[in-house]
């Protein structure tokens, strides 16, 4: 049997709409991600378990893990009979790359089970394709960091899908999921079809400056440039209490904050553990809306999807 864990990810990071994403892991050792197991069988079977298994489609063929198996078999040109188990630890529609976790874990597990017939580039292309079935368009800002780890910049030129951007070891990512769902498709539909010239210029300046600051090792500058003129001004209205939360975490001392992916999870960057804890405490009390919500203090997950058993 092969068992693969794929970590949560925070896409966009305010400054890089659809082109930046970071894999994250809680500092307390909690597994924030999905696990998929694969073993040989006489015919295909899929079993779901985990905290959020009851949120999955009841029809197996609608489950993205089934679709991963089906597409992987197509890529190899043969049917591979396996029993798969999805441990769904990630809330759906959370802005933490829930579907990317399932896709990355399923495809890496299948590839390992079959002796690695597909290279990383081919696997990543399949992940983007399958993620696109859920979000409505192919984009890699969750699957790339989830699969490869670290902070990833989407390139999509010269046969290169993404490349890693150096992160900062001192950064702590406070992630607060309020317990409500935001559809990626709905969050994309709310965005304008066209943008003002000054917003396009500001976006380019912020993103170029952020990448420069990462490579020139200027964490304060990098954090200061994490501004969103593309999505947040429009998506904030979908997130109850988001604007107040951003103001509060800034006053506590967060270096930057914004919407993780398409929301509703909020991320806040801190460079001191005590600041991160105060931010986490405030968000736990004021941003969470029900028992399904949670707050985690995280660091970059540099390993990405990996075999755990």
Curated annotation (Swiss-Prot):
Protein family according to the UniProt entry: Belongs to the GHMP kinase family. Homoserine kinase subfamily.
Subcellular localization, as worded in the UniProt entry: Cytoplasm
Pathway: Amino-acid biosynthesis; L-threonine biosynthesis; L-threonine from L-aspartate: step 4/5
Cross-referenced PANTHER family: HOMOSERINE KINASE, HOMOSERINE/4-DIPHOSPHOCYTIDYL-2-C-METHYL-D-ERYTHRITOL KINASE
Binding site for ATP: 91-101
Keywords carried by this UniProt record: Amino-acid biosynthesis, ATP-binding, Cytoplasm, Kinase, Nucleotide-binding, Threonine biosynthesis, Transferase
Organism phylogeny: Bacteria, Pseudomonadati, Pseudomonadota, Gammaproteobacteria, Enterobacterales
Cited HAMAP family: Homoser_kinase (MF_00384)
EC number: 2.7.1.39
Domain of life assignment: Bacteria
GO molecular function, one term: homoserine kinase activity
Keyword Ligase: no
Protein name (database record): Homoserine kinase
Catalytic activity field: L-homoserine + ATP = O-phospho-L-homoserine + ADP + H(+)
InterPro entries reported for this sequence: GHMP_kinase_C_dom, GHMP_kinase_C_sf, GHMP_kinase_N_dom, GHMP_knse_ATP-bd_CS, Homoserine_kinase, Ribosomal_Su5_D2-typ_SF, Ribsml_uS5_D2-typ_fold_subgr
Entries under Pfam families matching the protein: GHMP_kinases_C (PF08544), GHMP_kinases_N (PF00288)
Biological process, per Gene Ontology: threonine biosynthetic process
CC per GO annotation: cytoplasm
Reported function: Catalyzes the ATP-dependent phosphorylation of L-homoserine to L-homoserine phosphate.
